[in-house]
Amino acid sequence: MVAAIVVASVIILTQCFSNHENDSGTSIMVEVSATENEFDKIMDRCCEVMEKRIQLFCEDEPGLVKAKFSIKRTNDNKRIRIDFKNVELGHDQVARVLNLLQSQGCLQFYETYTFNELSDCFYKANVKLAEKDNPNLEADFKFLYEGPLFDLLKHSFNQIAPGKYEAERTACVGKAKAIDTLAINQMLIETRDLFPHDLKLAWTVEPEIVDDSEVLGLIALKLSPDNKCALNGEAISDARLEYSSYNGEPEILIMMNNEGAKSWQRITGNNIGRQIAIVFDGYVYFYPVVTSEIPNGRATISGGNLTTEEAINIVNILKAGMLPVPVTVVE
C-alpha cells in the first residue's frame, strides 16, 4: 500500500515494507523543503514533535505499547524516515498516524463578535453582491431571505415585537450547508472592506445534520490589537482526556502555565456574558459563554460530536507541541 501526502512544505510517503524474510513493518518518509538558513531548525523540530506524537500514539494503541519505531534523517539529509519495525499497521492505525503527522497542532483562543454587532455589515455585503449580479435591482427586496449571500448563509433573528426582529447576540453569525462554504468564503472575500478590520471568520469543525444535509456554523472571531488570537497553545502546560459529568461525552481538559493562567483570567474576566471561541487547526470546536472569571488556568474542549479517538489524538498533539509547518493531505 502506498499513499502520498503533500505538506505545505513537506511531503509524506507511507508504505508497508519488507526488507528481509522475517522483517516487515510500516515506513513513513517525510521530505522537508525550507530555506537554507532555517532548514536544520525545521528538521530538528519536526523530528522532535513527530517522535513525541508517535510515542504517545503507541502508548494509547492496544498492541503497540511495546512497538519499536525509529525516526532519523536520510543520507541526503532532506528527508525524515519513520520506521515501525516488525509491525504492519492496520488501515485505521495508518489513518491515525497520518492524522497525527499532518495536524499542525495549532490551538487558539479568540474573543468574539456577535451577529447583532455585525448584522448591518452582512446586510451591506448581501446588497453589494446582489447589485453586482443585477445592477437594476430594486432596493426593497426582502434582505432577510433574498440575495446571493443570504440565499446560502442563514442567520438567526429574535422576534421582539409584532413584525420587528433583532439579530441574535451569538458568535455564530450564520449557518450553511457544507457544500456551500467555499462559495460563501469567496463572497466574504469580495466584501471584506465592509467588515471590521479585526474580524476573522471560521467554520465549526463538525457539521450538524439538518434535513439530510451537513450544516456548519460560521463563527465571528475578534483579533487582538496586534492581529493575533487572545491566547495560543504556548500557554498550555498539559492536556488530558476526560468525560463530561453531564452527558458522559469525551472532552479535553487543558491546563495552562502561570503566564497563560494570568492571561486566561484576564480574558475571561473581560468577556463575562460573551463567548470565547476555542479553535484547533483553523476550525472552531467550542464557543462557550463565559459565566465568570476563570482564575485557575483551565479550559475545556468539548462538543462538535467529538469522539474519544479524536479527543485522544488532540490530547497527544497538544502534549507533543506544534509542527513548524502546516500539513494538508492530497490523494
Regions found by a protein language model. Name each.
Residues 298-331:
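Extended, hydrophilic extramembrane loops/domains of integral membrane proteins
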Residues 29-289, 295, 299:
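Non-transmembrane, solvent-exposed regions of membrane trafficking/translocation machinery
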Residues 19-28:
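Membrane-proximal juxtamembrane linkers immediately C-terminal to transmembrane helices
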Residues 2-12:
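Hydrophobic membrane-insertion alpha-helices, especially the h-region
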Residues 3-4, 271, 310:
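Hydrophobic alpha-helical segments and their boundary regions
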